[in-house]
Amino acid sequence: GTGVWGETTGTTQDSVGVYGSAPGSAWAGYFQGHLGTSGTLVKAAGSFRIDHPLDPLNKYLSHSFVESPDMMNLYSGTVTLDGEGNAIVQLPEWFEALNRDFRYQLTCIGESAPVYIAREIVNNRFAIAGGHGSMKVSWQVIGTRRDPYAIANPIPIESWKGTRERGRLLHPEAYGQTKSANNLTERERRSQNVHRTR
């Protein structure tokens, strides 16, 4: 069943189904378990935090997300070249259905050679050439999403703030401002939306 149900009848970017706030490093919301969304996640920063592999009882280990102005996917691997210094890298069958605008990186391992992309991605595979027999090459391919959701919902790199947000800051403390300079106060959030719980 559903523990909490939030819904708004508003249709603008100022409309919020569920709103929570917390001061300082406190959590405005915390989920013990999986978290899913069928829409777009918007955030100021992101990371993972796990029990530290070398000291799991006493420490955490955190890494930040890698961000991009594009909806990018990153794929990488290592391939061993054949006797003529060539290799074919096979990608998943859905690769070209999901990605476009490919970018490539190649790095030789253990020795140097003028390796290059001999054939770009066609039928979900690409070719490497210019190396030595049995040489290992690390490869990386980056693609931009071209699936229907990504095409229909591009993320604007720059955008104007909404009417209620104009002249205010998401993180006023970072700019040396008081919390009153925040985008919307909790009171305003409550007044503009109807919240329901079930």
Residue map of PLM features:
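Surface-exposed, glycine- and small/polar-enriched segments that build interaction surfaces at terminal
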Residues: 1-45
